[in-house]
Design a protein with these regions (language model features):
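N-terminal Rossmann-like NAD(P) cofactor-binding subdomain of oxidoreductases
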Residues: 1-69, 173, 195-197
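Structured loop/turn residues at secondary-structure junctions
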Residues: 23, 79, 120, 186-187
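A generic structural signal for alpha-helix starts
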Residues: 26, 122-123, 189-190
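C-terminal substrate-binding/catalytic lobe of Rossmann-fold NAD(P)-dependent oxidoreductases
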Residues: 40-179
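Glycine-rich phosphate/pyrophosphate-binding beta-alpha loops
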Residues: 105, 184-191
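Composition- and surface-driven signal marking solvent-exposed, interaction-prone regions
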Residues: 129-131, 194-198
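Conserved small/polar residues in nucleotide/adenosyl-binding loops
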Residues: 201-207
Length: 211
């Protein structure tokens, strides 16, 4: 399982089929990786607030899966997500530490992740924001994850090619070890942009390897 910014080194010349996770996993996985590296993580609670898609219903219908068959343009719909398993596959050090949940909301695009962490190391809101700004700017995440203090809303990330955009205004910290982050993402375009980038990398591997 590949998640950009988490385990890119897993791509090889022998990779005939690449499983690319989910848009949620790609939005939050790289952030969890750098936080785990700097502070250590005990537990993660992850809620994706997701725009509806063509797998949702536009009108209430009868059938199995009562919630999923409700009108997506009129309801906030709780649903399950496998993003925790995808992230744990890409970041084995977080295995059995992540609980994930999803809510589909009546917007066609533009989604967000409410990320709550119990850290191993004490910190503060300002320290975490400064660290995330620096690490995103200085390493290979700069074209994958972004950071902003702009007071944005969901429609502002429509068409954004980043996997995720951290909302610095919304960062919270309690008791120096309980952290909340908000991450915005275009649930279609950001994910598609990573697929294109990874596909290009895979295609150029023979050149890089001198084959």
């Amino acid at each position: 399982m590949l998640v950009s910014g988490c385990n890119d080194e897993s791509i090889s010349l022998e990779s005939d089929i690449i499983s690319f996770g989910s848009n949620t996993a790609n939005a939050v996985g790289p952030i969890l990786k750098v936080i785990e590296s700097e502070y250590g993580i005990n537990e993660v609670f992850l809620t994706t607030v997701h725009g509806y898609s063509n797998s949702n219903r536009l009108a209430d219908v009868a059938g199995a899966g009562f919630r999923k068959n409700r009108a997506a343009g009129e309801n906030i719909i709780p649903s399950i997500t496998n993003s925790s398993k995808v992230i744990e596959s890409a970041l084995p050090m977080l295995k059995d530490k992540i609980a994930s949940f999803s809510m589909t909301v009546p917007v066609p695009d533009g989604s967000t992740i409410d990320l709550t962490l119990n850290l191993k190391t004490k910190t503060s809101k300002d320290e975490v924001n400064s660290y995330l700004e620096k690490v995103i700017k200085d390493n290979s995440l700069k074209n994958i994850i972004g950071f902003t203090y702009d007071p944005i809303v969901s429609s502002d990330v429509v068409g954004n090619s980043l996997s995720g955009l951290i909302d610095g205004l919304s960062t919270m910290c309690i008791d120096e070890d309980k952290l909340k982050l908000i991450i915005w993402f275009d649930n279609g375009w950001g994910y598609a942009s990573r697929i294109i980038a990874v596909s290009y990398t895979h295609l150029t591997l023979p050149t890089i390897a001198g084959v």
